[in-house]
Design a protein with these regions (language model features):
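Basic, amphipathic N-terminal segments that precede the first structured/catalytic domain
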Residues: 38-41
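Catalytic toxin/effector domains delivered as secreted proteins or via bacterial secretion systems
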Residues: 43-179
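Fungal secretory targeting signals
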Residues: 1-36
Length: 179
């Protein structure tokens, strides 16, 4: 039986994460419930990771990334909707709808402790497989260690298939070509 190196690596990563997480049994689920739930979530995450590896294929010249927030009358708002509007208006695509379109469903964070890691993995694969020109809609405020600055942008910058990367300031509308 053939088991890919990526599957083994992801499985080891997920198992290691589960073992390293501190759990106070007396305040959480009983031991049998905890282990059943943990193994099920781990198996689900491994399945999603395999689907990401096999199926996530951005269309050439259509990738749009986003990160951060911008000010509004009611306080800071995420630029996610700005990126989605930009992508729709320009015939491009952001990661989440691309995943859905390709049959990949990352569980919500409340449903799986592996959700954040799966989003990071999907973001990395999306950036690595992007080709042609790419765009990023960015807020004037970004969390330290955000996925765009730590994973997506570095992958896009070293990706030889990406011919141009343009960053759009969601607050000012200013465009900056960074690659």
């Amino acid at each position: 039986m053939f088991i890919s190196k990526v599957f083994v690596l992801l499985f080891a990563l997920l198992v290691g994460s589960a073992l390293a997480a501190p759990v106070r049994i007396e305040r959480s689920l009983g031991e049998p419930q905890l282990s059943t739930r943990g193994i099920g979530q781990m198996a689900q995450a491994a399945g999603v990771a395999i689907k990401i590896k096999k199926n996530l294929k951005p269309t050439k010249g259509k990738s749009v990334f986003w990160s951060g927030s911008r000010p509004s009358k009611n306080g800071p708002v995420s630029v996610e909707k700005d990126a989605e509007r930009y992508a729709k208006a320009k015939g491009k695509e952001v990661l989440a709808p691309t995943l859905q379109k390709q049959g990949i469903n990352i569980p919500a964070q409340k449903d799986s402790p592996y959700s954040y890691k799966l989003w990071k993995y999907a973001s990395k694969v999306y950036a690595q497989r992007t080709s042609g020109s790419a765009h990023a809609v960015l807020g004037s405020t970004r969390r330290p260690g955000n996925i765009y600055d730590t994973i997506e942008k570095p992958e896009l910058m070293k990706n030889k298939k990406v011919t141009k990367l343009t960053e759009h300031n969601a607050e000012t509308g200013k465009k900056t070509v960074v690659k």
